[in-house]
Each structure stands twice: as C-alpha cells, then as structure tokens.
UniProtKB/Swiss-Prot annotation:
GO terms for molecular function: GTP binding; GTPase activity; magnesium ion binding. Pfam families: GTP1_OBG, MMR_HSR1. This is GTPase Obg. InterPro entries: G_OBG, GTP-bd, GTP-bd_Obg/CgtA, GTP1_OBG_dom, GTP1_OBG_dom_sf, OBG_GTPase, P-loop_NTPase. Transmembrane segments: none annotated. One of its GO terms (cellular component) is cytoplasm. It comes from Ehrlichia ruminantium (strain Gardel). Belongs to the TRAFAC class OBG-HflX-like GTPase superfamily. OBG GTPase family. Keywords: Cytoplasm, GTP-binding, Hydrolase, Magnesium, Metal-binding, Nucleotide-binding. The gene is obg. Residues 159-325 form the OBG-type G domain. GO terms for biological process: ribosome biogenesis. An essential GTPase which binds GTP, GDP and possibly (p)ppGpp with moderate affinity, with high nucleotide exchange rates and a fairly low GTP hydrolysis rate. Plays a role in control of the cell cycle, stress response, ribosome biogenesis and in those bacteria that undergo differentiation, in morphogenesis control. Its cofactor is Mg(2+). GTP binds at residues 165-172, 190-194, 211-214, 278-281, 306-308.
Length: 340
C-alpha cells in the first residue's frame, strides 16, 4: 500500500431541503389551515481519527466528496428526511488546513471527531408561520446551502520512538528485529522510502517505533527524501539515533543528522535522544570501544551498541522506562498494520 501523508480534497455538504407550503384538504373541512412541513437538514461531512487506518490513501482516489441533500418538507406537517452524513476515518495525527494554509483542527486522539463541512439547515414549512392574525400563511423558506470548501490534509505520525540516522545505518533491520514490522531491508541507501511503524512488547508494555527514511545533509532543503518525513519526527516522544559503526567518521555522521534536525525545527533537537552504535558485529571489540568512547565524549551521552546477534531487549527496556517516567506524555494507541 502506498504511503500518502498529504492530500487536497474538495468537500460539499448537503443542501437543506425546502420547506413546504400546503393546506389541509379533507372532506367537510372547509378551512383546514396550513400543514406544510419543514425540510430535512443537509448531510454533513465528518472526519474521525481511527487506528484502523494509517495513511491518507483513501483521498488519492476520492478527491471530491459530496454529502446528501435534505429532502423537502411534505404536506400533513411531515418533515423531509435529513441527508445522510458522511463519516470518513483518517489516521490519528491528521491535521486539517484550509486553502490558505491555516490550521483548522488536529485529530490527534482515538475517536476524535470533527465536522469539516456542515450541512445546510432545512427550510421552514408554512404551518410554522401560522399566527392569530395570519391563519393561512402561504410563505415558506428554502433550505440553506451546505458548506463547500477545499481542504488540505497533512499526516504526522504519532509514535513513542522515532528512529533516525543516515541511509543504510541499519534502522530498518533494527525495527524488524525487535518488532513485527515487515519493512524492506537491503544493503543500499534509501531502501526505506516511507515511514514504517512497528510495535514491540516488553514486559506486557507496548512500544511504538517509527522508522523515518534516511536523512542526508541538506534534507531540510529537499535533498534526498528526508525532507518529506522530517515532520513525522515532531510527533515522536523520544528519538533513537542509530549510527553505523563501520563509518570512518561517526562524529561527522552524528553531527550531520543533528544539524538537519536543528535547521528544520529547533524543537526536534530538544527531544530526548538515545544513541545506538549499530553493526558492531563487523568490528572487533577494541575498535568498537574506541568509537564508543569518542562518541560519548562528543555527545556527553551514554552510547549503546547493537549487532545482528545481540538482543535488543536492553535498549527497548530503557526506552520504555524513560517514556513511563514522563507523566506528561499521553501515550496514544497506534495502529500496527501487521498485527491484524
């Protein structure tokens, strides 16, 4: 399935049904009086955040959405049927903008609803205009037009841990080894072309990890493919920075990613970061020790190591402990597309 995280959609809510102008006509009743009913309301278009979807691909094939009009009122004081609402599920983390780019709402929690296009109100039938001085009104009102607009949808993935690093650092391999993600893995840059989600379970605790496609120098300006996905890092609670230990200059590798984060948004550099030296099975212990020490001196942070054979449980447990310590983080439920 294609990963679509932006879409432009035309919405037209239903028009309200017209009110009815009619009079009661029955045998032996000479002056039956007005009995025109109200028109039904037009259908609205509603978006609801759901873990059942994780991409905006629905809008790739459905770019024009129109709700049903309300039915006109009828005689005998019968109200017209209201148009059916259209309710569309969107991924948790979907932001809705108007055409000018102004944020309308942010659907960032499960089952959060928002009426994006309101249906028009039904018209009033002539029976409602009857008064003591006007016993036989003939006038009625037309139904109101429903809202009509273009909107822009943008998806920012919500996850506990955002996995970042240069292309081919082993991010996808790490995700696949500790979760049930079936992401594509190969020994060349930009294997991952779209964010991948995986769910790890440590001591019955769920940890959602997002593999962000590899960033390169200049990603914030559009180089490589990272600029399309830097926004997804904003919704991650913490960052796991994976570095290929076989690189000659691991400090430069680290600084490259940190620079791109700061140039995109200073807030990204303020997120808690854990550093993982990957592919340690390709070097001897002395080389790993030297690189680990150099990186620790530069970053002033604890450096973790990983290899194909080494269990990932230790680093995952540390990540979960850190997230659980922060009571301000409201852990969302994220759909795992491979656990169905």
């Amino acid at each position: 399935m294609s990963f679509i995280d932006e879409a432009k959609v035309y919405l037209k809510a239903g028009k309200g049904g017209d009110g009815c102008s009619s009079f009661r006509r029955e045998k032996f009743i000479e002056f039956g009086g007005p009995d025109g009913g109200n028109g039904g309301n037009g259908g609205s278009i509603i978006f609801i955040a759901s873990h059942h979807v994780n991409t905006l691909i629905y809008f790739k094939y459905k770019q024009h959405i129109k709700a049903e009009n309300g039915h006109p009122g009828l005689s005998k004081n019968k109200f017209g049927l209201s148009g059916r609402d259209i309710t569309i599920e969107v991924p948790i983390g979907t932001q809705i903008y108007d055409e000018e780019g102004t944020l309308i709402t942010d659907l960032n929690s499960e089952n959060q609803k928002f009426i994006v296009a309101q249906g028009g109100k039904g018209g009033i039938g002539n029976s409602r205009y009857k008064t003591s001085t006007n016993r036989a009104p003939r006038y009625f009102t037309l139904g109101e037009q429903g809202e009509e607009k273009w909107i822009i949808l943008k998806l920012k993935i919500i996850s506990d841990v955002g996995i970042i690093g240069l292309p081919n650092a082993g991010k996808s391999s790490f995700l696949a080894s500790c979760t049930n993600s079936k992401t594509k893995i190969a020994n060349y840059p930009f294997t991952t072309l779209e964010p991948e989600l995986g769910v790890a379970f440590i001591n019955n605790t769920e940890l959602v990890l997002a593999d962000i496609p590899g960033l390169i120098s200049g990603a914030h300006l559009g180089y490589g493919i990272g600029d399309k996905f830097l926004k997804h890092i904003e919704r991650c609670s913490i960052l796991l920075h994976i570095i290929d230990c076989t690189l000659e200059d691991i400090i430069d590798s680290y600084k490259c990613i940190r620079k791109e984060l700061s140039l995109y948004s200073k807030a990204l550099t303020e997120k808690t970061e854990f550093i993982l030296l990957n592919k340690c099975d390709l070097l001897d212990k002395e080389e790993i020790s030297i690189k680990k020490r150099l990186l620790a001196e530069h970053t002033k942070k604890e450096i973790f190591t990983s290899s194909i054979k080494k269990s990932k449980q230790h680093i995952l447990s540390i990540l979960i402990k850190h997230i659980n310590k922060d009571c301000s983080i409201n852990k969302p439920f994220i759909y795992d597309p491979f656990n169905t």
